[in-house]
């Protein structure tokens, strides 16, 4: 195997029970248990956990961890800007936009001329609420594979928003509830609704408020937003409201007149999932790369080694192997869907 440098990628990063570890750098990336020094790719709770001795992340990710876990979520914190380089042990690290959510980053770890890029979660399509994915040439690319099967092709999110707005126009007497993850997906859906020309107030479940307000404070224009808890039931007829997916099936929905249940997720490509959740209006909108995006990104990095961290590892590993790339699953346990429990509020607060 030929590398740009003289050090093997596995000498720079390797999987451990705590997550990806750089022994020569003295840190872990997105560790699943408390460690001395953690580099965090983004604020979703399956990647950003409290209790580490020190955390290095973008300012937005640090801020979101504070919102979720409180001021003392780590012993110490340090913010790093996109593109800045920092020496850690015998490595040099830099953070680059991942296009997943606000502040999300790929982490490039370099040593002796060899570069390993840990993608975290990413997508390669436009998103008005975060910086676009930046392609980095590297020797080894560590990719997610959440939607790592050919069946997952997300399509145009604008078309999914158009479905929602047609339903709102068709059923003006019904409230429309859109289930969406509280960090990233909710704000992107709101921005897409605004881009489609919808200028009426959009209503928020209590669990959405703090992170959505943070997005607004960072210059993301989301139009007029109102809290559901401050609104009478009659006013919610014909309205659009955003809530955590778990709230679509609880008594919170009684606040709305004859609600239409929608869910914005890449998993809505699988009709059985929509039926299982009782979703009336599935919306295929994802903050993860689909099959085509994963394959295109892997090929474009120029990496000769592809390590797959979580998702449908086998299919992507097989695709890489057929193209002469050295690929393997890392089988790291602990990553997956965002844990909405990290953002839940009580019924009274919602």
What are these regions (language model features)?
Residues 36-43, 52-59, 71-80, 90-93, ...:
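Active-site regions of enzymes building and remodeling cell-envelope glycoconjugates
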Residues 4-7, 227-350:
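C-terminal regulatory/interaction regions
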Residues 59, 145, 206, 266, ...:
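Short secondary-structure boundary segments
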Residues 45, 61-62, 185, 208, ...:
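Alpha-helix capping/helix-boundary segments
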Residues 134-135, 149-234, 305-350:
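Binuclear metal-ion centers of metallo-dependent hydrolases, dominated by the metallo-beta-lactamase
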Residues 3-33, 37, 43-184, 195-196:
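His/Asp/Glu-rich metal-coordinating catalytic cores
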Residues 18-32, 84-87, 223-239, 245-252:
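Short acidic low-complexity segments
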Residues 48, 104, 126-127, 186-190, ...:
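Short, well-ordered alpha-helical microsegments
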């Amino acid at each position: 195997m030929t590398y740009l440098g003289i050090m093997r990628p596995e000498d720079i990063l390797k999987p451990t029970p705590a997550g990806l570890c750089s022994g020569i750098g003295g840190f872990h990336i997105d560790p699943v248990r408390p460690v001395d020094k953690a580099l965090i790719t983004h604020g979703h709770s399956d990647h950003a956990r409290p209790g580490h001795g020190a955390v290095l992340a973008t300012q937005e990710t640090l801020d979101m961890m504070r919102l979720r876990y409180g001021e003392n979520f780590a012993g110490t914190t340090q913010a790093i800007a996109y593109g800045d380089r920092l020496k850690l042990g015998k490595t040099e690290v830099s953070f680059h936009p991942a296009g997943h959510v606000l502040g999300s980053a790929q982490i490039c770890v370099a040593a002796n001329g060899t570069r390993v890029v840990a993608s975290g979660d990413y997508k390669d399509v436009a998103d008005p609420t975060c910086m676009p994915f930046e392609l980095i040439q590297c020797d080894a690319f560590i990719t997610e594979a959440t939607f790592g099967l050919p069946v997952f092709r997300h399509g145009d999110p604008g078309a999914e928003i158009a479905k929602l707005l047609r339903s709102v126009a068709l059923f003006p007497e019904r409230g429309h509830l859109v289930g969406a993850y509280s960090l990233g997906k909710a704000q992107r859906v709101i921005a897409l609704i605004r881009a489609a020309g919808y200028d009426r107030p959009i209503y928020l479940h209590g669990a959405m408020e703090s992170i959505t307000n943070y997005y607004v404070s960072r210059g993301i224009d989301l139009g007029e937003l109102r809290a559901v808890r401050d609104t009478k039931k009659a006013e919610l007829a014909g309205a659009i409201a955003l809530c955590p997916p778990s709230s679509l099936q609880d008594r919170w929905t009684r606040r709305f007149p004859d609600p239409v249940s929608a869910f914005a997720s890449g998993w809505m490509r699988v009709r059985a999932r929509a039926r299982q959740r009782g979703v009336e209006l599935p919306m295929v909108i994802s903050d993860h790369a689909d099959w085509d995006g994963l394959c295109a990104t892997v090929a474009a990095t120029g990496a000769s080694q592809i390590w797959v961290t979580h998702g449908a590892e086998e299919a992507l590993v097989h695709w890489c192997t057929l193209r002469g790339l050295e690929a393997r699953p890392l089988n790291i346990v602990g990553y997956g869907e965002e844990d909405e429990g990290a953002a839940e509020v009580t019924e009274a607060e919602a």
